[in-house]
Amino acid sequence: MMMNKMVVANLVHRPIRSLISIVAIALEVTLILLIVGLCYGIMNDTKNRNAGIGADVIVQPPGSSFLSGISGAPVSAKIADVIRKMPHVTVVSPVIWQIATGGGIEVIDGIDINTFQALGGPFQYVSGGPFQGPDDALVDDFIARQRRVKVGDTMEILNHPFRISGIVENGRGARKFVPMSTLQELLGASGKASIFYVKVDNPANIDAVVSEVKAQPGMERYSVLSTQAYLSMMTPSNLPGFRPFIGIVIGVSTIIGFLVIFQAIYTAVMERTREIGILKSLGASKVYIVNAILRETLLLAIGGIILGIVVSLLARIGIQHRWPLVHIDRSNGWMLAAAIIAIVGATAGAIYPAFKAAQKDPIDALAYE
């Protein structure tokens, strides 16, 4: 109890240094939670929106994957007619995926609205309605909120003006939809498609349909996957650079915590020469001195962790309110991981100053008094 009072008194006696240390550790925790949450948020949002399309099987041209082959229209849209004639197939919807880079990277879906809605049900319109003409477009509610657009406004997509005919609820693949025929014309790809979404009469027949498509002459090299298998590939281990990037973020954050605590505790030890000398002259052991300094470090770390978690949660709310398209996942597991990382980094930074304090000779420590 006496030691705890002394530790708290030391922190209160130097409020600015204590506050700076807490803020630095909070920065470390916030950095980890926001960046990791952003990475997982982008991945999981993409995964959820693909699941929301409602397809059971996804057919892509040869060499495609969930990361590649998503732009342009490399194959004939008539493949949809071939697949549609197969047993157990109820709906086939050809779609053009086109990457646009204006104002950020995004995917535009060129759709046949009737077959696309047959996959997972009609679009849920927040306002407006379906395409009324070839130059109409649908956007989801997140795009509408962030870009501050409404039904009837004109939006430029792929350097072409489109009238927004409807705003739909998010979660159905892309965030912008245009008529497939219009996108084919803009790309000079008449009668072409990028991907085929297939609906099956019974989930038990999904594997049979996958095998049937792969066995179709001329389609042996196509990528044919059940939606479940397709989505299961969207994991950190399958995303190039995902894990190394997270590792770098954690490493940089840990170094920040280590250096700040090292500097703060080392300086504090140098300033407490007299106090340490008195404690040792009264019989305090080396273990007692080390224990006191590590407890002080632990209190700073706990304060920084609590502040960092609170700041990250508030920042997440603020970011998603200001930029609805930015998704930041909140994970209790990563909160625990960030707390452990902060404590380990802070403790590592305090070990050398703590042992240096424990080695001080009481006579030398009091020599200038």
Stretches with model-predicted labels:
Residues 11, 278-287, 360, 368-369:
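Short helix-to-coil transition segments within interhelical loops
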Residues 15-42, 239-278, 298-307, 348:
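Hydrophobic alpha-helical transmembrane segments of multi-pass inner-membrane transport and secretion
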Residues 30-107, 208-217, 221-223:
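Hydrophobic, regular-secondary-structure patches
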Residues 46, 212-259, 268-273, 287, ...:
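Peri-transmembrane interface segments
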Residues 57, 143-144, 165-170, 191-217, ...:
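A short beta-strand structural signal in non-transmembrane regions
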Residues 95-96, 104-114, 124-182, 192:
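Hydrophobic secondary-structure segments that place a key small or acidic residue at a functional site
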Residues 331-369:
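C-terminal membrane-exit region of the final transmembrane helix in multipass inner-membrane proteins
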